[in-house]
């Protein structure tokens, strides 16, 4: 089982969300650490796994620019903003984990923190399960592959890649013809897969 240490960085004016996350019950296999500053501090942004930034009474574009430039690729950025600040966030939406509109009632704060916590744990559980699966199938010398109903390879093992002389990045998300360097997918292969799916065997 994994252990996950989460470093939270809280920046901007102190608010109810900051108070609530500090007393959020810690889930099994997780630990929490908090850093906090009124104005953005690059060193704290760089260390953070999760950033909650209260943009009220701050220069939105400047603050967002500092946060997005300094944060790690995997760090999640949740911004707290007033409704009238939404138009200033438009250019950055794809880089934000979420936007929480202020003011929020205590019940909504609790709901949002709980939902974030569940989603975060789910991502770590998925990472662990994926790691277990990869370790298992890569230990097996036989060719192993998982395909969707359209014949697209979703996951393959190392032996498969070695046989087709392609990387996983090249193979996953592609069909039979590309992987095996043939002009078109084998009709017999497509038919046999269709029969298996219909019979569910």
Question: Which residues does each PLM region occupy?
Answer:
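PAS/LOV and related PAS-like sensory modules
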Residues: 2, 16-20, 128-151, 162
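Structured helix-beta-strand junction loops
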Residues: 47, 73, 95, 139-140, ...
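PAS/LOV-family and closely related PAS-like sensory domains
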Residues: 31-34, 143-201
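N-terminal membrane insertion elements
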Residues: 2-123, 127
């Amino acid at each position: 089982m994994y252990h996950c240490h989460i470093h939270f960085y809280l920046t901007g004016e102190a608010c109810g969300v900051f108070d609530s996350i500090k007393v959020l019950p810690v889930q099994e296999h997780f630990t929490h650490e908090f850093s906090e500053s009124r104005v953005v501090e690059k060193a704290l942004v760089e260390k953070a796994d999760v950033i909650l930034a209260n943009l009220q009474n701050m220069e939105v574009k400047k603050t967002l620019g500092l946060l997005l430039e300094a944060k790690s690729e995997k760090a999640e950025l949740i911004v707290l903003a007033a409704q009238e600040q939404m138009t200033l966030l438009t250019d950055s939406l794809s880089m934000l984990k979420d936007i929480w509109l202020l003011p929020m009632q205590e019940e909504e704060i609790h709901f949002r923190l709980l939902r974030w916590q569940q989603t975060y744990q789910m991502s770590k559980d998925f990472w662990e399960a994926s790691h277990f699966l990869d370790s298992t199938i890569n230990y097996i010398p036989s060719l192993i592959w998982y395909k969707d109903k359209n014949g697209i390879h979703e996951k393959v093992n190392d032996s498969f890649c070695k046989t087709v002389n392609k990387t996983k990045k090249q193979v996953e998300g592609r069909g039979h013809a590309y992987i095996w360097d043939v002009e078109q997918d084998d009709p017999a292969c497509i038919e046999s897969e269709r029969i298996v799916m219909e019979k569910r065997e």
